Amino acid sequence: MPKGFGSSVIDAPVDEVWERIRDFNGLPDWHPGIARSEIEDGRASDSIGAVRSLYLQDGEHVRETLLALSDLDRTQTYDMLKGPMAWWNYKATLRVLPITDGDRTYIEWSAEFDAKPEDEAGLIEFVEQGVFQGGFDALKKHFAGN
């Protein structure tokens, strides 16, 4: 099972970063690859089992389910039900931790999925550089005030 992983440091307190990324329906507010998001069936966005319909900037549609959300651990885990990517059984976790030296935040995003062997390397690069790093860069820019 291929795995993707990315991490970064955000120059902002962990509670502020968590507040920015916590909302399962709020991805368009901070990730440049997402045009809009809607929670299906009128559920609350922090309700385990909530399904979000994401519309990517290129018009593609993705559906994901919130599997776990912990304010104590500052983690969010979700899986992908539908999307244009050539993977299946996609499951990801986004987590933030405090860095006490300088009141900064360590952020990590990881995913595992199944894919055809010939597609694995390209999909890992896409998720690590396009999805994860794209999100980290946008968060850094936001908290830098740019």
Q: Where are the predicted features?
A:
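Glycine-rich portal/gate segments that line the openings of hydrophobic small-molecule binding cavities
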Residues: 29, 38-86, 134, 138-146
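Hydrophobic/aromatic beta-strand elements that line small-molecule binding cavities or substrate pockets
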Residues: 6-8, 62-68, 90-98
